[in-house]
C-alpha cells in the first residue's frame, strides 16, 4: 500500500482500513506466538502500513 493511494481515500475509508490492519496485526501476532507464522516479515509490513494510515489521518486532521 502506497501513501499516494491513501491520500486519495476519505477519512472514513482510512478509519476502516486502520481497523482492518489492526485486526490483521492481532491475528499475525497470535500466529507468531503460537509458531504458526512462516513469513514473519508480514508483521513489519502491517505495522508500517498502520503507521502510513495514521500519518495520513493526522495530515488530513491538520488540514
From Swiss-Prot:
Belongs to the universal ribosomal protein uL29 family. HAMAP family: Ribosomal_uL29 (MF_00374). The keyword Ribosomal protein applies. One of its GO terms (molecular function) is structural constituent of ribosome. It comes from Alteromonas mediterranea (strain DSM 17117 / CIP 110805 / LMG 28347 / Deep ecotype). Signal peptide: none annotated. GO terms for biological process: translation. The gene is rpmC. This is Large ribosomal subunit protein uL29. Keywords: Ribonucleoprotein, Ribosomal protein. One of its GO terms (cellular component) is cytosolic large ribosomal subunit. InterPro entries: Ribosomal_protein_uL29, Ribosomal_uL29, Ribosomal_uL29_sf. The keyword Ribonucleoprotein applies.
Amino acid at each position: 500500500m502506497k501513501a499516494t493511494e491513501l491520500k486519495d481515500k476519505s477519512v472514513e475509508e482510512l478509519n476502516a482500513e486502520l481497523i482492518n490492519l489492526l485486526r490483521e496485526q492481532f491475528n499475525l501476532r497470535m500466529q507468531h506466538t503460537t509458531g504458526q507464522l512462516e513469513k514473519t516479515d508480514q508483521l513489519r509490513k502491517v505495522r508500517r502500513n498502520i503507521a502510513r494510515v495514521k500519518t495520513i489521518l493526522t495530515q488530513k486532521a491538520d488540514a
